[in-house]
């Protein structure tokens, strides 16, 4: 199982654009879901400006209700315990949500609302900055240390790949803008040259 996840991480590395990356990440979520026999696997992006989490990716098992449309703006105030843990780089491993009812009451309400009984969640980082987290709902596995460590690696890797692609696309946009400006300038110079020739 671990090897299959690692293979998909290599595929994510090879993504050439945002569309390929999105498809590769979606496949990764499906693989994690299959390996853990879970009901749902998803990614939340952290919007530090608005202090909200936004559900950006979701994979659901058979006959499992999707929640992505309802989770586009989860206020950080509703996830204080998780946010603090993720910022420390800690993962969340919950074998039974009833055991954390008093420890994290806000998160408990969110989990119960989605019919979640057990949970694994781990942060996504880029250069020590929290970018979001990956969640695995109702997994049917033993939470082995090696597997949890692998999920942590996945979180860090996704953060790096997504940010690198974002910066690459931004650079390409700036280059295209610069090329257009130079083209417009050359066209204007040619036009002025023709005018001057006609005038003379």
Residue ranges of model-derived segments:
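GAF sensory/regulatory domain recognition
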Residues: 30, 42-87, 129
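A short, aliphatic-rich beta-strand micro-motif
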Residues: 117-125
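PAS/Per-ARNT-Sim sensory domains
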Residues: 77-81, 99-107, 173
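Amphipathic alpha-helical "output/dimerization" segments
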Residues: 126-129, 142-173
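Short glycine-/small-residue motifs
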Residues: 132-133
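Signal-transmission linkers at sensory-effector interfaces
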Residues: 1-23, 34, 170-194, 198
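Short regulatory alpha-helical segment in sensory/regulatory domains of signaling proteins that mediates
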Residues: 10-20, 28-37, 43-48, 111-112, ...
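Signal-transducing coupling segments at domain and membrane junctions
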Residues: 95-118
